Protein backbone atom coordinates (compact mmCIF):
# COMPACT_ATOMS: atom_id res chain seq x y z
CA UNK A 1 0.00 0.00 0.00
CA UNK A 2 1.72 3.16 -1.19
CA UNK A 3 1.02 6.74 -0.21
CA UNK A 4 2.78 10.10 -0.53
CA UNK A 5 6.15 9.85 1.23
CA UNK A 6 5.60 12.91 3.42
CA UNK A 7 1.93 12.11 4.10
CA UNK A 8 1.28 15.66 2.89
CA UNK A 9 -1.21 17.31 0.57
CA UNK A 10 0.85 17.34 -2.62
CA UNK A 11 -2.02 15.68 -4.53
CA UNK A 12 -3.97 18.93 -4.16
CA UNK A 13 -1.18 21.31 -5.09
CA UNK A 14 1.41 20.03 -7.53
CA UNK A 15 1.13 17.01 -9.83
CA UNK A 16 4.90 16.63 -10.28
CA UNK A 17 5.57 16.85 -6.54
CA UNK A 18 2.77 14.35 -5.92
CA UNK A 19 4.23 11.88 -8.43
CA UNK A 20 7.71 12.26 -6.89
CA UNK A 21 6.35 11.65 -3.38
CA UNK A 22 4.43 8.56 -4.47
CA UNK A 23 7.35 7.12 -6.43
CA UNK A 24 9.69 7.75 -3.50
CA UNK A 25 7.41 5.77 -1.20
CA UNK A 26 6.88 3.04 -3.80
CA UNK A 27 10.64 2.70 -4.29
CA UNK A 28 11.15 2.46 -0.52
CA UNK A 29 8.51 -0.28 -0.24
CA UNK A 30 10.08 -2.22 -3.11
CA UNK A 31 13.52 -1.84 -1.53
CA UNK A 32 12.31 -3.09 1.86
CA UNK A 33 9.90 -5.85 0.79
CA UNK A 34 11.00 -6.77 -2.72
CA UNK A 35 7.56 -6.03 -4.17
CA UNK A 36 6.16 -2.90 -5.76
CA UNK A 37 2.87 -1.73 -4.26
CA UNK A 38 -0.19 -2.01 -6.50
CA UNK A 39 -2.71 -0.18 -4.31
CA UNK A 40 -2.53 3.46 -3.27
CA UNK A 41 -3.84 5.37 -0.27
CA UNK A 42 -3.71 9.15 -0.40
CA UNK A 43 -3.09 11.27 2.69
CA UNK A 44 -6.30 11.45 4.73
CA UNK A 45 -7.93 9.29 2.02
CA UNK A 46 -8.34 12.39 -0.19
CA UNK A 47 -9.83 11.48 -3.56
CA UNK A 48 -11.04 13.08 -6.75
CA UNK A 49 -11.31 11.60 -10.23
CA UNK A 50 -8.35 13.78 -11.25
CA UNK A 51 -6.22 12.30 -8.47
CA UNK A 52 -7.47 8.84 -9.41
CA UNK A 53 -6.36 9.38 -13.01
CA UNK A 54 -2.89 10.44 -11.81
CA UNK A 55 -2.68 7.37 -9.57
CA UNK A 56 -3.69 5.09 -12.46
CA UNK A 57 -1.09 6.76 -14.71
CA UNK A 58 1.55 5.83 -12.10
CA UNK A 59 0.63 2.18 -12.60
CA UNK A 60 -1.53 1.49 -9.56
CA UNK A 61 -4.38 -1.00 -9.93
CA UNK A 62 -6.46 0.22 -6.99
CA UNK A 63 -6.94 3.05 -4.54
CA UNK A 64 -8.32 3.09 -1.02
CA UNK A 65 -10.51 6.10 -0.30
CA UNK A 66 -13.20 7.27 2.11
CA UNK A 67 -16.67 5.77 1.86
CA UNK A 68 -18.45 8.57 3.72
CA UNK A 69 -22.24 8.51 3.59
CA UNK A 70 -22.46 12.20 2.65
CA UNK A 71 -20.43 11.40 -0.48
CA UNK A 72 -22.04 8.08 -1.39
CA UNK A 73 -25.64 8.99 -0.63
CA UNK A 74 -27.69 5.82 -1.14
CA UNK A 75 -24.72 3.80 -2.46
CA UNK A 76 -22.86 1.31 -0.29
CA UNK A 77 -19.10 1.35 0.36
CA UNK A 78 -19.19 -2.46 0.12
CA UNK A 79 -18.62 -2.70 -3.64
CA UNK A 80 -15.63 -2.12 -5.87
CA UNK A 81 -16.06 1.12 -7.80
CA UNK A 82 -14.00 2.58 -10.66
CA UNK A 83 -12.49 5.98 -11.37
CA UNK A 84 -14.49 7.88 -14.01
CA UNK A 85 -11.36 9.26 -15.67
CA UNK A 86 -9.40 5.99 -15.46
CA UNK A 87 -11.87 3.06 -15.41
CA UNK A 88 -9.08 0.51 -14.90
CA UNK A 89 -8.42 1.97 -11.41
CA UNK A 90 -10.47 0.10 -8.82
CA UNK A 91 -11.71 2.15 -5.88
CA UNK A 92 -11.94 0.44 -2.51
CA UNK A 93 -14.08 2.48 -0.12
CA UNK A 94 -13.46 2.52 3.60
CA UNK A 95 -16.44 1.56 5.73
CA UNK A 96 -16.19 4.56 8.05
CA UNK A 97 -18.59 3.21 10.68
CA UNK A 98 -16.98 -0.21 11.08
CA UNK A 99 -13.52 1.38 10.93
CA UNK A 100 -14.37 4.06 13.49
CA UNK A 101 -15.98 1.51 15.81
CA UNK A 102 -12.48 0.09 16.25
CA UNK A 103 -10.33 3.17 15.68
CA UNK A 104 -12.32 5.70 17.70
CA UNK A 105 -14.97 4.05 19.88
CA UNK A 106 -13.47 0.71 20.94
CA UNK A 107 -12.44 1.74 24.47
CA UNK A 108 -15.19 4.32 25.07
CA UNK A 109 -17.12 2.97 28.05
CA UNK A 110 -19.98 5.38 27.28
CA UNK A 111 -20.47 3.92 23.78
CA UNK A 112 -23.70 1.92 23.56
CA UNK A 113 -21.83 -1.08 22.06
CA UNK A 114 -19.10 -1.14 24.72
CA UNK A 115 -17.42 -3.51 25.33
CA UNK A 116 -16.80 -4.63 21.79
CA UNK A 117 -15.68 -8.22 21.27
CA UNK A 118 -14.47 -9.77 18.03
CA UNK A 119 -17.42 -12.16 17.70
CA UNK A 120 -19.90 -9.30 18.03
CA UNK A 121 -18.01 -7.29 15.41
CA UNK A 122 -17.93 -10.22 12.99
CA UNK A 123 -21.69 -10.65 13.54
CA UNK A 124 -22.19 -7.04 12.42
CA UNK A 125 -20.27 -7.78 9.23
CA UNK A 126 -22.16 -11.04 8.72
CA UNK A 127 -25.47 -9.15 9.02
CA UNK A 128 -24.66 -6.96 6.00
CA UNK A 129 -26.55 -7.78 2.79
CA UNK A 130 -25.14 -10.93 1.16
CA UNK A 131 -24.37 -9.10 -2.09
CA UNK A 132 -22.13 -6.64 -0.23
CA UNK A 133 -18.95 -8.71 0.00
CA UNK A 134 -16.21 -6.04 -0.01
CA UNK A 135 -15.69 -4.63 3.49
CA UNK A 136 -12.71 -2.28 3.84
CA UNK A 137 -11.75 -1.51 7.41
CA UNK A 138 -9.00 1.01 7.74
CA UNK A 139 -7.74 3.16 10.59
CA UNK A 140 -4.73 5.28 11.31
CA UNK A 141 -1.85 3.53 13.03
CA UNK A 142 -2.28 6.01 15.90
CA UNK A 143 -5.45 4.08 16.82
CA UNK A 144 -3.20 1.41 18.29
CA UNK A 145 -1.68 2.61 21.52
CA UNK A 146 -2.63 6.28 21.28
CA UNK A 147 -6.36 6.61 20.60
CA UNK A 148 -6.98 3.09 21.89
CA UNK A 149 -4.62 2.41 24.80
CA UNK A 150 -3.01 -1.01 24.78
CA UNK A 151 -4.67 -1.59 28.16
CA UNK A 152 -8.02 -1.58 26.31
CA UNK A 153 -7.09 -5.01 24.83
CA UNK A 154 -7.25 -3.62 21.31
CA UNK A 155 -4.46 -5.94 20.17
CA UNK A 156 -6.24 -9.00 21.57
CA UNK A 157 -9.40 -7.87 19.77
CA UNK A 158 -7.53 -7.57 16.46
CA UNK A 159 -5.86 -10.96 16.96
CA UNK A 160 -9.27 -12.57 17.56
CA UNK A 161 -10.91 -11.14 14.42
CA UNK A 162 -9.54 -13.69 11.89
CA UNK A 163 -10.46 -16.60 14.18
CA UNK A 164 -14.01 -15.31 14.69
CA UNK A 165 -14.41 -14.66 10.96
CA UNK A 166 -13.25 -18.19 10.15
CA UNK A 167 -15.62 -19.65 12.74
CA UNK A 168 -18.48 -17.67 11.21
CA UNK A 169 -17.64 -19.10 7.81
Model-found features: residue ranges?
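Extended hydrophobic secondary-structure segments that form protein cores and membrane-embedded regions
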Residues: 39-42, 137-139
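Catalytic alpha-helical scaffold of carbohydrate-active enzymes acting on polysaccharides/glycoconjugates
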Residues: 1-38, 45-100, 115-132, 149-168
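Active-site clefts of carbohydrate-active enzymes
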Residues: 89-108, 136-145
